[in-house]
Each structure stands twice: as structure tokens, then as C-alpha cells.
Amino acid sequence: MGSTMEPPGGAYLHLGAVTSPVGTARMLQLAFGCTTFSLVAHRGGFGGVQGTFCMAAWGFCFAFSVLVVACEFTKLHSCLRLSWGNFTAAFAMLATLLCATAAVIYPLYFTRLECPPEPAGCMVRNFRLAASVFAGLLFLAYAAEVALTRARPGQVASYMATVSGLLKIVQAFVACIIFGALVHESRYGRYVATQWCVAVYSLCFMATVAVVVLSVMGHTAGLGCPFDRLVIVYTFLAVLLYLSAAVIWPVFCFDPKYGEPGRPADCLRGSCPWDSQLVVAIFTYVNLLLYIVDLAYSQRIRFVPTL
């Protein structure tokens, strides 16, 4: 009996998935990711929240890169109920951010030029230095994929491959940094005004994630309203909400009437509320800028939701 699963074009494997420029970048991601993970796990070592985050980031990116390469090479992605172009663009951007963060954190917390005062200390140092180098190369490999797949002017592309789509991933990532600072001794519950800021961060984060999920799942066509128009309206509202938080949060955290204008001298490093409040303030302005840029780009994009 003949097979009912004949692949399009008569070929079961797609060699371009590993030989094209994007495919080459993905193969480098696998090589650098496996090398970085192995160097740290074998002898480099890690510990604490920072080390666990780095290992989790590298492991997550490596696992999904294997999935992407395998699906493209075997053409199985055509069987998945999602928009493959949106999925790969969103993952590449997220992996770039995760690997960039890990490439900064691991050398900062674990790498030293001098040898540790322990047996085989110089070997541990060398492994950590090598892991730091490959972590940087891993970030560059993911950044290269983002650059290669990003939609160009006049090009028909999926939403997540546009500047606006990529910015959605960055906005959600920055919001996660804000949430991390909020739960770390930020004292946001002292005033209703700062609680409003937390509500703003949460609402915008959930809406941004919803936009990404709808795009990746390919469900943007059944919303009853043009998806690009909904995105523009939401982005405009997010700019207004973040603008309010950008004014309210610094006032209620750093004005002498409500908080501390400067870092208290008795504030312990690693558990200082003022530090967390400063991180929230900085990344509030970062996300405000990202939403403004997103709004500007959203006026000009045209995308195909099913790619």
C-alpha cells in the first residue's frame, strides 16, 4: 500500500535547514550551547540563583534549538498547529535576550583572572573563562539569526519577525526584570500609587504575552477586528500606562516626603529596598521607550499572520 504521507517536493529532508545562512546560525547555536553547558557542568561549576539561571537559560535555549532544527530538517513543522515563522522569530529573540543576560551574569559572578585557592583551581578558572567565551559566542549566534530573519522594508513577513513583533519579546523580558525587582524587598505595597504601578506592569505584561501567543498560535485572523489595529490601540494604551508609572514610581520611592532620595548608608548589599526600587524605576523608563518605539513602528508594518 502506498504511503499517504508523501512530503511536498518528493524529499523527506530539507537540507537548507542546516546549510542556509539561518541554518548555519542554528547549527552554531547548537555547538556553542552544548559547549557552554558542558564546560560549566563538567568543571567550571556554578551556584546560587545566578548560576542556576545561567544553566537554565542555556539548557532551555539548547533544547528548543534542537526542536527547531529537527522540525525544519524533517519538515515536521508543517504538521504543527502554529505559525512556524512567528514561533521561530519569537524564540530567536527570547533566546538572544536570555543568552545575553547569561553571558553577562556568569563572568560577573564566577569568572576571575586569578586562580582560586583550591586544588585544581587554575583548571576551574580556565574552564570558567572558556565557558564565558562560548557564552558570548552563543549570544552572537542567536543575534545573527534575529538579524537574518528580521523583516526588511517591503518584505512580506510574519508579525513576530517585524520590529514591532521583536519588541514585544523585549518588552515582556524587561517586565520580568521589573517583577524580579518588585518581589525582592521593593516595598511596593506601602502606597496605593506604587500598587497602581504594579498593576500597570502586570496588565501590560499580560497583554504583550497575549499578542505573542496569538501570533505564534496563528489565531490572529479570528479576532473579529484587524489584528494590526488592535496591536496599535493596545500599544498606545501601554504608552499612556507606562507614562503614568514613570512619573508615579520615582515620586513615591525617591521623594523625601515618601521615600529615600539617596541610598541609605545602613542598607545591606543584596537586600536593600532602595536598590530594588531603583531597578524598577530604570526599567520602567526602558519599557516606556520600547513601547514608544513600538508604537512608531506599528504605524508602518504590514504582515501576514499565517506565515
Swiss-Prot record:
Q: Which GO terms describe its cellular component?
A: cytoplasm; membrane
Annotated compartments: Membrane
> Where in this chain does the record put each MARVEL domain?
17-154, 159-303
The similarity annotation says: Belongs to the MAL family.
Q: What is this protein called?
A: Myeloid-associated differentiation marker-like protein 2
Can you tell me where the transmembrane regions are? 53-73, 90-110, 129-149, 163-183, 198-218, 232-252, 278-298
Q: How does it sit in the membrane?
A: Multi-pass membrane protein
- Please, which domain of life does this record's source organism belong to? Eukaryota
Matching PROSITE patterns, A to Z? MARVEL
| Main location per the UniProt record | membrane
Q: Which UniProt keywords apply?
A: Membrane, Repeat, Transmembrane, Transmembrane helix
Q: Which PANTHER family match?
A: MYELOID-ASSOCIATED DIFFERENTIATION MARKER MYADM FAMILY MEMBER, MYELOID-ASSOCIATED DIFFERENTIATION MARKER-LIKE PROTEIN 2
